[in-house]
A protein has these predicted regions:
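Metal-cofactor-binding active-site regions of metalloenzymes
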Residues: 1-185, 194-199, 205, 209-210, ...
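Active-site glycine-centered loops adjacent to acidic/histidine catalytic or metal-binding residues
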Residues: 190
Length: 236
C-alpha cells in the first residue's frame, strides 16, 4: 500500500493533543517568526516525559487569546482533512489558557468556535476532551471540569488527566474523579505512561472508561483487568 493510498483511507483520531498538533505554518503565523522543526519536536535522545512535555511550551504561546484558540481549532481540522480524518477527539487543557482577558468558559468556547468553523469547511467531525493537569490543584481542576460540563454534548465529550505522572501518582486524584462522576462527566485518564503500573489500576478503579498512553498495559494482570472491566484499549 502506498502513502497516497494510506492518506485516502478514512481515519478516526482518538488521541490528539491540541498544542501538539498545530501546523508549523500556524505557529509561525501566530509568533510572527520562522520556527525550526527542532523547536517543535524532541530528539532521539529524549529521556523523560518531563523533557518531552517542554516541547508543548512554544505552541502554547500561540493560544493566549480567543483568536489563537479559534485559529488553532480551525488549523487542526484543516490538516486532519488532508489525511482524510473523518472524526477526531481533541484534548486540551483549558487552564493553560486562562488569563485576565479569558476565563475558562471563554477559553473552551473559543476553541469550539474554531473547530465548528473547521467542521463546516473541511467536513471533519470532532469532540473535545478537557484535560485536568496533575500539577494544578484539586480545586482548580474541579472548577475546570465543572465549567466544561456546561458544554457536554455541545462539543465537549469527556474530561482527562494528563501531565507529569511520575511526580503526581493517581492516588492524589481519586477524590477529583469521584466528584467528576457526580457531575456526570465521562472521563479518560493518562496512566502507566511512566511511573508504576498501579496508576492504571487506580485509574480504572476511579472510573476511567479509557486509559491513554499506557505502556504498562503489557503486564498480564493489567490486561486481564482491562478485559474484565471492558475498558477501551489504551491509545499509544
Amino acid at each position: 500500500m502506498t502513502v497516497n493510498e494510506l492518506r485516502q483511507l478514512p481515519k478516526i483520531e482518538l488521541h490528539c493533543h491540541l498544542d501538539g498538533s498545530l501546523s508549523k505554518e500556524f505557529v509561525e503565523t501566530r509568533l510572527q517568526r520562522a520556527v525550526s522543526c527542532e523547536e517543535l519536536s524532541v530528539s532521539d535522545e529524549c529521556t523523560s516525559l518531563v523533557e518531552y512535555l517542554k516541547k508543548f511550551d512554544l505552541p502554547g504561546q500561540c493560544l493566549t487569546d480567543e483568536e489563537g484558540l479559534f485559529g488553532a481549532g480551525y488549523d487542526v481540522l484543516r490538516t486532519m482533512s488532508q489525511e482524510n480524518v473523518c472524526y477526531a477527539e481533541i484534548r486540551f487543557a483549558p487552564l493553560f489558557h486562562v488569563s485576565e482577558q479569558m476565563n475558562t468558559e471563554q477559553v473552551i468556547e473559543s476553541l469550539l468556535n474554531g473547530l465548528e468553523k473547521g467542521k463546516k469547511d473541511f467536513g471533519v467531525e470532532y469532540n473535545v476532551i478537557t484535560c485536568a493537569m496533575r500539577h494544578h490543584s484539586a480545586k482548580q481542576n474541579y472548577q475546570m471540569i465543572k465549567t466544561a460540563c456546561q458544554f457536554l454534548g455541545r462539543g465537549v465529550c469527556a474530561a482527562d488527566l494528563a501531565g507529569a505522572e511520575a511526580q503526581y501518582p493517581m492516588t492524589e486524584f481519586m477524590e477529583l474523579f469521584e466528584q467528576t462522576k457526580k457531575l456526570g462527566m465521562p472521563f479518560t485518564i493518562h496512566a502507566g505512561e511512566c511511573g508504576n503500573a498501579q496508576n492504571i489500576v487506580d485509574a480504572i478503579e476511579a472510573g476511567a472508561k479509557r486509559i491513554g498512553q499506557s505502556c504498562h498495559t503489557r503486564i498480564k494482570h493489567i490486561l486481564h483487568l482491562i478485559e474484565r472491566r471492558h475498558i477501551l484499549r489504551p491509545q499509544i
